[in-house]
């Protein structure tokens, strides 16, 4: 079998992996094999946590809406149900921002749905 000299291809591949892991500590950014493993692990975590980030923000918005709603003697569940029944289409992100930044507007929304 003839020898294959990969030339710059192998070096370019290794340098891309090492560039991806620059900033990692110790051998995880210096040695190719460990850097490759950590790079794959980091990409796996990034993929997983993109979904988790959406989940966490939704939980945060629901908590904020619930706290503001309970200050006005209505539960989160009843509030969301009333919004749908009155065909008021505000998503949880916007409701949470209104609840945090503009209490009067939030109270007005609650007055409309009661």
Curated annotation (Swiss-Prot):
It comes from Psilotum nudum (Whisk fern). This is Large ribosomal subunit protein bL20c. Belongs to the bacterial ribosomal protein bL20 family. One of its GO terms (cellular component) is ribosome. The gene is rpl20. GO terms for molecular function: rRNA binding; structural constituent of ribosome. Binds directly to 23S ribosomal RNA and is necessary for the in vitro assembly process of the 50S ribosomal subunit. It is not involved in the protein synthesizing functions of that subunit. InterPro entries: Ribosomal_bL20, RIBOSOMAL_L20_CS, Ribosomal_protein_bL20_C. CDD domains: Ribosomal_L20. SUPFAM superfamilies: Ribosomal protein L20 (SSF74731). GO terms for biological process: ribosomal large subunit assembly; translation. Keywords: Chloroplast, Plastid, Ribonucleoprotein, Ribosomal protein, RNA-binding, rRNA-binding. It is found in: Plastid, Chloroplast. Pfam families: Ribosomal_L20. Its main location: plastid.
């Amino acid at each position: 079998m003839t020898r294959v000299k990969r030339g710059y291809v192998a070096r370019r591949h290794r340098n891309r992996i090492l560039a991806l892991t620059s900033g990692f500590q110790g051998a995880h950014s210096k040695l190719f094999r460990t850097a490759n493993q950590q790079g794959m692990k980091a990409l796996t975590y990034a993929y997983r946590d993109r979904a988790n980030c959406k989940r966490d923000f939704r939980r945060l918005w629901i908590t904020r809406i619930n706290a503001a709603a309970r200050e006005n003697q209505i539960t989160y569940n009843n509030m969301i149900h009333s919004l749908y029944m009155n065909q008021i289409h505000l998503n949880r992100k916007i409701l949470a921002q209104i609840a945090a930044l503009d209490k009067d507007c939030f109270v007005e929304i609650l007055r409309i749905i009661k």
